[in-house]
UniProtKB/Swiss-Prot annotation:
Its EC number is 2.7.7.6. Belongs to the RNA polymerase beta' chain family. DNA-dependent RNA polymerase catalyzes the transcription of DNA into RNA using the four ribonucleoside triphosphates as substrates. The gene is rpoC. The lineage of its organism: Bacteria, Pseudomonadati, Pseudomonadota, Gammaproteobacteria, Enterobacterales. Its cofactor is Mg(2+); Zn(2+). Mg(2+) binds at residues 460, 462, 464. This is DNA-directed RNA polymerase subunit beta'. SUPFAM superfamilies: beta and beta-prime subunits of DNA dependent RNA-polymerase (SSF64484). The RNAP catalytic core consists of 2 alpha, 1 beta, 1 beta' and 1 omega subunit. When a sigma factor is associated with the core the holoenzyme is formed, which can initiate transcription. One of its GO terms (biological process) is DNA-templated transcription. Zn(2+) 2 binds at residues 814, 888, 895, 898. It holds the Pfam family RNA_pol_Rpb1_5. Binds 1 Mg(2+) ion per subunit. Binds 2 Zn(2+) ions per subunit.
Amino acid sequence: MKDLLKFLKAQTKTEEFDAIKIALASPDMIRSWSFGEVKKPETINYRTFKPERDGLFCARIFGPVKDYECLCGKYKRLKHRGVICEKCGVEVTQTKVRRERMGHIELASPTAHIWFLKSLPSRIGLLLDMPLRDIERVLYFESYVVVEGGMTSLERSQILTEEQYLDALEEFGDEFDAKMGAEAIQSLLKNLDLENECETLREELNETNSETKRKKLTKRIKLLEAFIQSGNKPEWMVLTVLPVLPPDLRPLVPLDGGRFATSDLNDLYRRVINRNNRLKRLLDLAAPDIIVRNEKRMLQEAVDALLDNGRRGRAITGSNKRPLKSLADMIKGKQGRFRQNLLGKRVDYSGRSVITVGPYLRLHQCGLPKKMALELFKPFIYGKLELRGLATTIKAAKKMVEREEAVVWDILDEVIREHPVLLNRAPTLHRLGIQAFEPVLIEGKAIQLHPLVCAAYNADFDGDQMAVHVPLTLEAQLEARALMMSTNNILSPASGEPIIVPSQDVVLGLYYMTRDCVNAKGEGMVLTGPKEAERVYRAGLASLHARVKVRITEEVKDGEGNITTNTGLVDTTIGRAILWMIVPRGLPYSLVNQPLGKKAISRMLNTCYRVMGLKPTVIFADQIMYTGFAYAARSGASVGIDDMVIPEKKAGIIAEAEAEVAEIQEQFQSGLVTAGERYNKVIDIWAAANERVAKAMMENLSTETVTNRDGEEEQQVSFNSIFMMADSGARGSAAQIRQLAGMRGLMAKPDGSIIETPITANFREGLNVLQYFISTHGARKGLADTALKTANSGYLTRRLVDVAQDLVVTEDDCGTHDGILMTPVIEGGDVKEPLRERVLGRVTAEDVLKPGTADILVPRNTLLNEKWCDLLEESSVDSIKVRSVVSCETDFGVCANCYGRDLARGHIINKGEAVGVIAAQSIGEPGTQLTMRTFHIGGAASRAAAESSIQVRNKGSLKLFNAKSVTNSAGKLVITSRNTELCLIDEFGRTKESYKVPYGAVLGKGDGETVNGGETVANWDPHTMPVVSEVSGIIRFADMIDGQTITRQTDELTGLSSLVVLDSAERTGSGKDLRPALKIVDAKGDDVLIPGTDMPAQYFLPGKAIVQLDDGVSISAGDTLARIPQESGGTKDITGGLPRVADLFEARRPKEPAILAEVSGIVSFGKETKGKRRLVISPLDGGDAYEEMIPKWRQLNVFEGEVVERGDVISDGPESPHDILRLRGVHAVTRYITNEVQEVYRLQGVKINDKHIEVIVRQMLRKATIESAGSSEFLEGEQVEYARVKVANRKLEQEGKVAATYGRDLLGITKASLATESFISAASFQETTRVLTEAAVAGKRDELRGLKENVIVGRLIPAGTGYAYHQDRIRRRQLNEPAEAPQVSVDEATANLAELLNAGFGGDKK
């Protein structure tokens, strides 16, 4: 027995390892893995089906085919364990060793490993410094390479053709050594002296100046160093021994009908063995060189195909003409080892079925069909049956269950009680796609789902299916109950809003019961309380909507949790009073004393959660649902065609629009407007008409006139069913009702452009054939889009998860004082996102002061919850610096304070929370709701483009930011700076509106003046850019020569003449170098200086500028000297929706990006070339000037002599995030990406917390490029993990050495995922071959820090409940404690024994 226990112990292999290293395998290493050489290509004997000896399935090498039985059958049973049969040479052991024992093939000639040869950049090529083409020619026996030059003029690794080789032989005899084939490459690699080579290259690096050469040298140095450090030998990249995969991993399966299905690998191996054996024979026979060479080449090709079929030349195909699956194909791609078997596996104890509604369930329950439960919980039932003594053996229990005896059902009930199951609906886009429920047994075959969790699962009941999983172990059950129970997931991790919100019928029911109606039955009653209200309603004495007075008792909790009650009569309705009965005590009555739409209900649940906590909220949500369903049924709201009331005004509006269109058509035909303008105007007219029809329709639908008690007429909100459904948010929207009862409006073509003839009919009137045809256009596009969208969205999520997977909260506080400044998002007159929503759940980075005082309002490191946010709003704080993941100082991971609140729980985040994955899911999950299309600015959109004034909406005072201005003769301000912002501040000092003001705008009111709502505060001409004079004086023309640099033009309509500056391309010879400008002089003729500088006021005019003043005219400051027409760039496409989000996260440089100033200084223009201008910026402190060539067609925002700051926009365009990072820093790029991504989601009405985007940005910024190495071991220009630079610099500073300097890099998410430290994670993401090749050559260690690596090696992940386990292991490793030896308990031993004995004795029962 002792031996047996010892044997069982030996079977549990060690799981204690800290890292995984990948390296090149040396021939000795391969031989040490091997259990024997495979000499024959045979697989199994066709008659006996026994494996052939020395073949690919040989039992002697790989192990027995049957458990504990040798091949010839001499030794059977467990007692001969470990014996090697003398007859057939097979060891008697378990057959599963055939999954792990490897063999090998001794190759007759070395062959190069194709990965190191062809995976770019070619490692062999880099190492030998030879072009890949040359190496290939040597390998495939087309030319010779000099291995040893000896005393001759031949260089080492020089390529010789056949003729050159023969000539050299004649000339030098055997002074030199040249070979061909892999042997040649092998000996070249063997002769490399890595250390010396490295030294030489480093010296070269210091001497060289050319950029390309430096790059090449650094690459080679890095590769050489990798070889030196990792202990890999270069010659191992050429194989002399080929390992053979264990046979059970490349099985040969007999099919019925005597045929066999085989793995492609067997074919590939067979091919290698055949060629190898033939080559051996040829060598023994001393065959002619040319034949041997051919055979060697074929062997090389066979090995290539085995390792990576199709990488070189045509892929080898099988009998069915499709390429064979090689070893590389086994691990890469969606069907490869990583993604198919390691990252996701099929699991036992699971089932799936269609789902239906369970409206009577509680929130934590799901209905499980009895049949399914019986199958899923079988082992538990067997155990219980045996325990109770109802069945003597497992077999008997099995029989009972199969017969479905009555007692079995009772046992099932017991087993299921308190045993949660997991329900999952594919696609699982975020963590709420798997939740735990307590099963309730039901008849039938469909799983019943609680309606409120449908939103989280995105489930509906039109045939969706769901899978059930049973957590088996106690720990798993505990986790399911404590963390995954649906009642614990009330808030969405993406936005922190409740995700368990009623929708559809429930909303309709609640809306119906909380509406009031004029002169309803029972109006004016005074009731003692909600109970009486319900009684009068049930008795039919009062209607649900009657306006009554009811005595209501409210309980209010204060900060300390003391409860005060106040009771009083409230004006309300019967329905609201009845609803009040289910509202938890502690919430104010005002929450229900309003018509409840979807938003109001969501707010009510949110308030309930924040005030009352989890349990009351869950009970309340359930009650809301039951009540809602009940009253929706009572309301009897239904839809008939007469409910779609068509407004009378419709015909008139459409006639007016048609008249306008006709007028524009006439203008077009008489040539007053261009085709583009006509198209845009027509679309504008129809869009406006559509809006008017919709408005008339909604006015018509939403109100009705009724007679009240006093007999007077009164307007009240309508009880039209369609309107109620839309108004409550239950189903439908104003846009849809517009199509039913208004007009369908403008339709789009599949390419996104708008068809200019609208559909004037609606669905109630019906469409004619043409209208119907136009409609089908857009509808089909929609369907095609949806399919594309799903795939793209899924891929975006995958990339996001991959880049962020290893980000986990690892400490409580990193102690940084850094953070990002949060301000409300304001666009024009709208506050898109108030400050409180942006800072809620964040931690302050520094003390927040009361505005205008030095009192501390909120101390540093405070988690801003709802109460603090209310305080901030009362004190009207405008901007707050909060901690952010981007500025977190934690090396690997983030700290809790920088992250702030765990949105799904409402308190500060716990250590070990996988914030990276949560962020990725939160951004990716709504991806399918985003549009795929790029918007054309045309029609409705172009109206916004040509704004020419600012009208404020609210009363307040104006404030200008980064503004330079001059006062013109009329006493108004003229803006002379580029990125000016104008904000409107209310009386509390809060920013209400914010506008961009262009250069040359004239302000009606000055800085700090008060304005009223609706006042126009700024005007400008949208179509031209003025040149504004900053000084007063007399104009002098410089270099303005008629016919050379300018021409005169006369306007046909007005008769006024103006000067137009010629573009330098249009000028003749002498005019080329002239630079037309306007100088401003005083009465004496001296130059006037620009105030505050010693520069004369002269304005250089670009081509196409129009001057309407004459030489010698006196002007005053603020006057327009010239106008530059702005070409409208036609209809520019704005990338919207999903592609835009992907572009931002991939950090793609836009086409024609904005040009930003690289340094601060004064702008001037140097010598021009054919198509480009030379922009020169001279720093004010007299440093080196910065020059840049800019294409002529770019419109510049700066004039000569203007002062720009670093990072200012010189030429407009979409900004490149890389430029923003380089010139404005990390915070600016974070702000840019966050705002741009939010912009896309906001358009779709999706709420995502900024945090999640910041988390991804942090991961995009995790690399840095070394600028100067200091005393560190980094190379200049090397890209290193930012955390590693920080750690190294800290160490260097402690030792008093020079730290390395670096610049942060922004990587797109795909690149960032592939550039991670962990090769396992990168290889399982994309480009598996390249990642593994790189890692093997460098001998990389994977420290298994991230989640993915740990999933792949089959451990608990270092996050969530696995976090403690990993922390414990790290602690033990630091204390150098021995890993606990795996203890085998008696139970396990008996279980294993039983398994062994069953295997031994019951083998022949099959």
